[in-house]
Amino acid sequence: MSDSIEIKGARVNNLKNINVKIPRNTFTVIAGVSGSGKSSLAFDTLYAEGQRRYVESLSSYARQFLGRMNKPECDYIRGIPPAIAIEQKVISRNPRSTVGTTTEIYEYLRLLYARIGHTFSPISGCEVKKHSTEDVVKQVMTYSKGTKFVVLAPIHVSEGRTMEQQLKAYLLEGFVRIFVKGDFQRIDDFLAAGDCEQEEIFLVIDRMSVDDSKDVIARLVDSAETAFYEGGGEMQLMFLPSNITYSFSMRFEADGMTFEEPSDQLFSFNSPAGACPTCQGFGRIIGIDEKLVIPNTTLSVYDGCVVCWHGEKMKEWQQWFIRHAAIDDFPIFEPYMNLTQQQKDWLWHGLPSDKDATEKPCIDEFFKMVEASQYKIQYRVMLARYRGRTTCPTCHGTRLKPEAEYVKIGGRSINDLVQMPVVRLKEWFDRLELNEQDQEVGKRLLTEIKNRLQFLLNVGLGYLTLNRLSNSLSGGESQRINLCTSLGSSLVGSLYILDEPSIGLPARDTDRLIHVLKDLQDLGNTVVVVEHDEEIMRAADYLIDIGPDAGRLGGEVVFHGNAKDITSSKGSKSYTVRYLLGEETIEVPKSRRPWNLHIDIKGARMNNLRGIDVEFPLNVMTVVTGVSGSGKSSLVKGILYPSLKRHLGEVCDAPGEYLGISGDINALKHVEFVDQNPIGKSTRSNPATYVKAYDAIRDLFAEQPLSQQMGFTPQYFSFNTDGGRCEECKGAGVITVEMQFMADIVLECEACHGHRFKHDILDVKFKEKNIDDVLNMTISEAIEFFRKHRQDTIVKRLQSLEDVGLGYIKLGQNSSTLSGGENQRVKLAYFIGQEKQEPTLFIFDEPTTGLHFHDIHKLLEAFNALIARGHTILIIEHNMEIIKCADYVIDLGPDGGDKGGALVAKGTPEEVARCPESLTGKYLKAKLSP
């Protein structure tokens, strides 16, 4: 086997016939500016070939489920192992998928609870046990040798028989005696007396003396089995002459309740055996939404936390509840957020003293009254106002049957564990003490669980809980979870290709991520990472830089070699090398912009926020920082953005919990959240249509003499509408043929040969270029072309795309092929191109995603251009290059999850760097130092 992966003549996308060698079993980073060809080399060449070879080695039956990848365009690739790609995508859209199921930790927890879980009665709190013959023998052996005892079985009359018939049947089976009314009697004597209808009669199975000999123990086991059989799973031991009795039951019951025996299916919310019957294992139902009924949890019942009980008429329900609350010591002056779960249940479902009442004051009864009055319009409106997707009232969001809650390990149920942040869960397992038998049975399972929890901690996800939905994770979080799953599977001899695993990761956790990648390498794998993070580049064994620029100006290998040897490459045309050597830097601003106007959020307590007060300056660049899970998104996306939207009279989701918003709100006319979601709702949308440049291009072609002569309007030059587009492929340029045993074949359309338009439309040209030629130009090429021919309107609309570093993408590039970071920058370009004069707050969520140092420099220039026009920039960011250039920093923390949500530091970057409690400040200090 070759000691390196050798790629010869790669020509995928913009790669210029490059030759690359990647040492096997190393940690390699592929770097370069956006659009230089990194992903073309890593994913479209390396991964495509590794996956293709692996899939083609399988049977045709297996291939139909896997699909097949096309062979990448290159001369050859040698020494490539099976490839696994871990991308920044939220792969699971399944509403049942959680962090626990994705990492397989939950599967091991289910098995652990099924194997060593102990069931406890919710009534007495005593452990529920199912006895066996072994328990009977153990009890007998606690007595001294020679002690006499009797094995008894309670008599259960079979259906259709009388007690007399049952006893006669026992006589025929060879049984002689019974125990009734504290006395032993012969069955025939008892039958002769004629008093058979007694309440409780026991059948004597055997009379024995305590002895530890094998024969006696074997006889005892046989007798116990017979007693369990005849007694319907129940039996007794009576020791003589004291008549001390011990009861045994093979039934799993206690306190009059029959319990379900623990099994892995009992703890599965994907199985009917374990799923909550009300919500079918989803944890949520359509019903009355608690957050809408009680939006402000800092208020008490007395202060009016239940908003549907406001108003002259509805207030009677509040007063009714308060009158009854004293009987059960309900704390009417306690804020709702401080009530116990039991007290909340009383408010929602009824007080214990009203248990048997036909009418009772509680929220459930109130809404039953509203539902019964739906024929009145005001009640229909009220019901609609408070209805939403809410937590299941039966399982309280745990998704499991109540029976699962009774099974515990170390005093905790499986529901308790999945609601703990991973960091606390790992500590709990480290402290868990088990008896010798449970330790032996659960040893392997505990090892797997602890290892996987440690992997999650190592990649900075200690703030997540195992019941967190997979589809609510960011792309970076999803990728790191998949990385943990890969480590847990312990594959060896594979090629792992990762796409920017550092996305969304604060500087503190980058070191941990590097260790995880090294662990993956140490297992015997080759790790290739497409990355822009400086620390990860410096930690790599091997560095490949693709460039020097983007698009047609990229696609070359401008540096390759040991990452430690870059000092010998001074004066390189590689931007990566120049930034790593300090030959080029992003300068710290000489001064910070002053500000007077601001918006204040009071008492923010959504998710883990601790009722904090935060000031957001206007007309400057503010960055919200903090470790993952510290509350940044809750503060900005969950509270500030929807609050401002509502204040401006725009429709949006309800903001999270907070006390109020104040300040210079009227100084803003608009608020825009620039996220990484795809541009446009149609897969046919492209950057040119989004920035409105394509409208001007279509107008230009419609003005040409041939168009005038043929009657072609601008609509004819659109591939989205009938008229000028090719009707065979509907303007797609390709025809997709479904293949069962292979991947779908995408063929060039035979009618238009991939040009998307009819021939007579393609005959219309502007300066020797038809509409298809223009759509295939990169942004940079199009600007150059239209500037040369003085089409200033088109140039002006395209220039903003160039300004944000997207000059390498094509005008007609399908929006579905753009990354999240590219989508975000297209939206930024749109706002820059608009030249909006009304003061606007622009909110960005990690805009440096996918950006090289050189691209960040361009991005900062775009931000400064918006601020110069009187707008405000607010950014959620981890990248120190952006943070050091901010005018104001808001640092949340100090950690993630329940250890976050506090305002750790605020002020200029220099002020935050001086704060000893701020982790951001610690790393910022190094960036600000000369």
Residue ranges and their predicted role:
Residues 1-930:
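Conserved phosphate-binding elements of NTP-dependent enzyme cores
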